[in-house]
């Protein structure tokens, strides 16, 4: 039987030739010796003939970080590794030189090879070996067996490391003594050959700025060690003398910039080296290096940086008078860096009464420093941007109060001066009985009018200090209506609603049918509230639409004479704004659910137009979570609030989910679901709402697009960020982020990243990590909310059902609110 073998065709031959040409070119470029084989990552030299006489280096003498392994064996003519030879291979990790003629390793041989992890120098001609080539390397293995070491002090360092079990495995290393006797290295004894020691004269170096100090370093060891000082980043002038023992270091005119630096004394001989260190503490007078006008964050903050040692005491002054701090206005130190303190004066909901000059005084026993900054938080009422005031009714009497106690930082408002009609003198005792009766009747009627007219004016009543200082809000949600499904819709069009800082078009979802005014529920009836039944107490905040006040509302509920409410005003009196106002009121009237903030009605008697919502005692959920988290002790004074339990977190989460189920059933898309837009009432009752104020209070949560639009991108899915597409599925994504907020006690999502970095992470498919206190079942639920494709996300009803089941499995105790 004849077998046929196909001969290589010309194409295959050409390919093989090309490969050989490429390999040959690379080999030539590297300068690979004849006894070596070279690749892009490895050099292998094991052929004894013709052999190599020096360590292989690249022909172009440029650094190469691709080669990670060099293996050399059977090279009897290779006797040394010199400076700058191995240094060309900066990426080298493994070096093997075995069964060769190696006699010498330069002390600078591996100075550039910081990645070296493994060195094997076995079976060579090494009679001595210094420690210096290896002291800066983080080696996992250094193998030195079967070398003709000579018993001397120079190899004592190898014994010391063997004794301290520096290597993963003990090695049988031998040396030859003066009698040509071969002994184990571990049994080697060399007189006057010890590891040196070093001791500083002072380990608590303290000096006043501008003074001088001298430090001594006493060393011992055999052979006598060389001494050096390590003075990294030392700014002050200094002199050292290491020619005698003890060595000395004198620092002159010490600078405060050197406070906190470490000063080290190093003693080194051929056995090894030791280092001892002490921290330099410089005492100096305070210096306020930075102070700036207030910036809005979660609270208003006047930022500052103060240097000083000992730690300066800080005192604030307002308009020249001492500012007594309280829970509403206090100094917070955020970062301490040696003797540098970064912090701010934090003000909770300041008003125009807090405008003025603030002076910071920093003082310690070495001196003091002060800096002043002007602060403007709010315009004075009555200048066109203040709250609604009837000048004929109210007289504002401002008393210079202690601004530190914000519960007393309100205008003292006098009640209307009710003038009682003076009693008319009797002209004669003979006035007819009929006229007397008529006068009495008139007086009775006047008294009745005065009695029931006391609440007939819409304005602020009484000092605001009697009301809780919590911020609370609720707001319109967004119904999916017919119109353009692009963000380029006319801002002033009929489908635009006021959202925080701007008007944003209502986005159409083609899966739903739109709803117009004619399609509202037939029984839709917006309750109208008389203006004289609304009495403002204090301002809660301000959005683009206008201001929000805490108020008392009379005759709203049959069972109560008056109740606390949140009042939202409309400052824009244009026709379009009024149309939006009425349309919004009709939509809100249809939202009736136990976990949606209740809308009571409107007041349209005169200007401004007013919406009335229920008031939630404990404010927004984000502040509530922070106040009941592990970091609450950093923010609170006095008793620390009780920390939320896992079951209470689940109870909160399932209430929010219940509210979102209802909104989805009504074809509403929230578009700004976050803990800052949820409110907390009695017995851990949580409701969804939003006055739009959160864009002012939580400004860092929003990303400004163009000149006006602010988007909560940390809560938005990819399709909303990239295409401005808002649907029930995008609300599901936001609900997952809300769950993450709850189980982190109110942390900001992606708090470690800038807004641009957050956009990049979300659009690239990254998700938030599992919170430390979060059960796996809840995190799996979060991941179900964060699927990139909207149709792959969990259904809102599924989420509510899962949270309900988890909450039922863990009973809730509601005494957290006291």
Curated annotation (Swiss-Prot):
Cytoplasmic side: 451-818
Residues of the site described as Interaction with PLCG1: 813
Keyword annotations of the record: ATP-binding, Cell membrane, Cell projection, Cytoplasm, Developmental protein, Differentiation, Disulfide bond, Endosome, Glycoprotein, Immunoglobulin domain, Kinase, Leucine-rich repeat, Membrane, Neurogenesis, Nucleotide-binding, Phosphoprotein, Receptor, Repeat, Signal, Synapse, Transferase, Transmembrane, Transmembrane helix, Tyrosine-protein kinase
Glycosylation sites: 66, 94, 120, 199, 204, 226, 253, 287, 324, 337, 408
EC number(s) from the headed UniProt entry: 2.7.10.1
Residue positions of the active site: 672
Catalytic activity: L-tyrosyl-[protein] + ATP = O-phospho-L-tyrosyl-[protein] + ADP + H(+)
Pfam family, one: LRR_8
Subcellular location: Cell membrane; Endosome membrane; Cell projection, Axon; Cell projection, Dendrite
Sites of Phosphotyrosine modification: 512, 698, 702-703, 813
UniProt LRR repeat ranges: 71-92, 95-116
Modification after translation: Ligand-mediated auto-phosphorylation.
Bias (Polar residues): 400-418, 481-491
One function term, GO molecular function aspect: ATP binding
Residue ranges of every copy of the Ig-like C2-type domain listed in the record: 196-281, 295-364
Protein name, UniProt field: BDNF/NT-3 growth factors receptor
Organism: Gallus gallus
Taxon lineage: Eukaryota, Metazoa, Chordata, Craniata, Vertebrata
This protein's encoding gene: NTRK2
